């Protein structure tokens, strides 16, 4: 679809790489767009009140950034990841921005600052891949 938008003729579609097409259209990778959306949604969830149902689904009540099933004493079913989706995003954000988990809550509460850090993370990810 992006090749058609870029005006690449049909006989040459298979000869033009994805990177060239993205460069011509000034578009980003889908994986970077998905990461940006996931991190922004995580920030939205973390800005919710502690007893909000959405936050309770992602995190256990009365714990700071402690995803469910980590301290329950149960093992995960065979084939399931050891850490869940929210935990993965939190670790990625903390490693990139070099902040601790409690400090992350302060950063998330400032929406503009959090969005700036997310954009920086996504631009770094786009350069790497």
Question: Residue ranges of each PLM-predicted region?
Answer:
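Short linear motifs embedded in intrinsically disordered, charge-biased segments
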Residues: 1-129
